[in-house]
Swiss-Prot record:
The gene is luxS. PANTHER family: S-RIBOSYLHOMOCYSTEINE LYASE. Its cofactor is Fe cation. It is an enzyme of class 4 (lyase). Pfam families: LuxS (PF02664). This is S-ribosylhomocysteine lyase. InterPro entries: LuxS_sf, Metalloenz_LuxS/M16, S-ribosylhomocysteinase. Gene3D superfamilies: S-ribosylhomocysteinase (LuxS) (3.30.1360.80). NCBIfam families: PRK02260.1-4 (NF002604). It comes from Staphylococcus epidermidis (strain ATCC 35984 / DSM 28319 / BCRC 17069 / CCUG 31568 / BM 3577 / RP62A). Belongs to the LuxS family. Keywords: Autoinducer synthesis, Iron, Lyase, Metal-binding, Quorum sensing. The keyword Metal-binding applies.
């Protein structure tokens, strides 16, 4: 396989076992700041995907709530394949803490009574949301918390 510019295009999606959270890359800025990008894979690539309303609500809930647990988040974005999200942190390379931050954020999702910014002023497709869908996705991921660091399903 030819090396691609996009890191995830170099990942063999047939070898990974979701759910997992993996360090997908780092980038150092001119002033020494380091961005750590993590792949939060909720669904098995090419076998499952998140339905868009649930994914969309999960994005809103995670993007808003993760910042209550750390000031190191640069961005949280959904993958176009609908199998996961990317989250980027600045100057924060503690993998175990990242797992805990994601855990806390997903518990916030379970406790949510509404989707933040779920309106036409603050969202580009406000009609496409499902709080219950987001909660179902979050619970399924939390149910397999012990697998998050086992990217290839090796029982490690």
């Amino acid at each position: 396989m030819t090396k691609m510019n996009v890191e995830s295009f170099n990942l063999d999606h047939t070898k990974v076992v979701a759910p997992f959270i993996r360090l997908a890359g780092t980038m150092e800025g001119l002033n020494g700041d380091v961005i750590h990008k993590y792949d939060i894979r909720f669904k098995q690539p090419n076998k499952e995907h998140m339905d868009m309303p649930g994914l969309h609500s999960l994005e809103h809930l995670m993007a808003e709530n993760i910042r209550n647990h750390t000031d190191k988040v640069v961005d949280l974005s959904p993958m176009g394949c609908q199998t996961g999200f990317y989250v980027s942190f600045i100057n924060h390379d503690d993998y175990d803490d990242v797992l805990n931050i994601i855990d806390q954020t997903l518990h916030d999702v379970l406790n949510a009574s509404e989707v933040p910014a779920c309106n036409e002023v603050q969202c580009g497709w406000a009609a496409s949301h499902s709080l219950e869908g987001a909660k179902t996705i979050a619970q399924a991921f939390l149910d397999k918390r012990e697998q998050w660091n086992d990217i290839y399903g090796e029982g490690k």
